[in-house]
Design a protein with these regions (language model features):
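The conserved cystathionine-beta-synthase
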Residues: 16-34, 41, 82-100, 107
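A glycine-centered beta-loop-beta connector
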Residues: 30-33, 38-54, 96, 104-119
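Tandem CBS (Bateman) regulatory domains
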Residues: 1-12, 52-82, 88-97, 118-148
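Short, flexible active-site loop motifs that bind/organize anionic cofactors or intermediates
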Residues: 13-16, 46-47, 82, 111
Length: 148
């Protein structure tokens, strides 16, 4: 399965954040849209980073001062690993496992068109396994009939 098909199946609108927005705004958006990360985009809608719940916990709340005034650009991951819509889902799983990340922005022509999570990929693999099991249970029944 291609990433393009996966983000179409998910059908969720991509939520993003700007580098000059505050961590409070990130937390509100993560909570409102039930997300674990947000791609960070510039004024031209190009991907410039990603911020995750883990970034906030490790880099912001570990500080002794308040996070209210901290800007996204201060704690976001700037070297973003991303995928394209034409990549295979298996490739995305391999990259996420190798890089130890749980969210992979999908970029086309420099713009974020989707966000794939490890959970999305696991859900697809689980569905594929269920389908395989269903068909494998039907197969013996069909082959037992004599062909006339």
């Amino acid at each position: 399965m291609k990433i393009r098909e996966l983000i179409k199946v998910g059908g969720r609108e991509v939520q993003t954040i700007g580098p000059n927005q505050t961590i409070s705004e990130v937390v509100q958006k993560l909570s409102k849209f039930n997300r674990g990360s947000l791609p960070v985009i510039d004024e031209h809608e190009h991907l410039v980073g990603i911020i995750t719940e883990r970034d906030i916990v490790r880099k912001c709340f570990a500080r002794s001062d308040s996070c209210d005034a901290v800007k996204v650009k201060e704690i976001m991951t700037k070297e973003v690993v991303y995928s394209t819509p034409d990549d295979d889902a298996e490739y995305a799983v391999m990259v996420m496992k190798q890089k130890r990340i749980r969210h992979l922005p999908v970029v086309e022509s420099g713009k974020v068109v989707g966000l794939v999570s490890m959970r999305d990929l696991l859900d697809i693999q689980l569905e594929n396994c269920k389908t395989e099991v269903r068909y494998s249970q039907l197969l013996p029944r069909r082959t037992q009939r004599p062909i006339v």
